[in-house]
């Protein structure tokens, strides 16, 4: 049993309230008590008989403390890069012309398939560690660059094994075999969709938490997405959907119909789409870096106005975005989407916990996981000012990250 007291917290942003001169008592991997330091009890039943007997006391020097950040949308299992493609894209080439020339997701699939497991694992490990060291304690991580049964299942297992290593964030694994149609299935898209639906049970057995489909122009139709998502839901996977990145194809309506845990992207939305998400309680995952790259911003302020739950994701992927810092994503969300700092920080904590079905994190409160970050600042406004606020210390489940 380990009891740790974090004290002299100048500003504690819990997710529920903001406290000054605060303290947190941690018992093993959970928060036992949180509040203003003058209110710290002398004893906590089942935790410590006398507060002077705690194992570790850490003075945080008046700093800002928040819950560990949560990245609700990433694609970290890949090899190679597409730097040259991005340079061409920014020069005016269309996505269609790049794909026709052998670029796009398909090029990453080719490289990833040709990469040995050891090299692939090391690349994913480095990315995941980058998230944790920048203050992100939970990462949603998608497969989707092998697009074979064995390759996709190996990616699920890889993520699960890496999560067990020291100094790694918690990982929510999403099965995204329905990313694009692989070349060996060109002209047989329906056959591939049916195969992916059949693989969902194997993905769940391998440790996947969610199933996702890229439902958009050039990817999968709503009917195809329905088949895969329903197949995943039937074996216990949370359904989520890439929606409205290139066009409106009914993905939002499908998300409402199936009770999806989130609709992600949402660069192209109508007032009707927003009303549907609000009415049926479909959360939105938005990614400012990718939205800026694509030149289409989701109507985040309008969604907030209508009561849609917002979560933030980096959308880390080999084609558009290499970000592993959610503090940078928060700053970009404030600047690009017009979110308040408080709304953006909630979207990067409680919002992420909501869409990942993880009520044990995202808020600093008794009984929650002790995923805690001390920042190099004394106020949350520093997130918007710094564009990449650095943590001083990170605790994952009450254990300091080295």
Where on the chain are the PLM-derived regions?
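Divalent metal-coordination and catalytic microenvironments
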Residues: 9-10, 24, 29, 62, ...
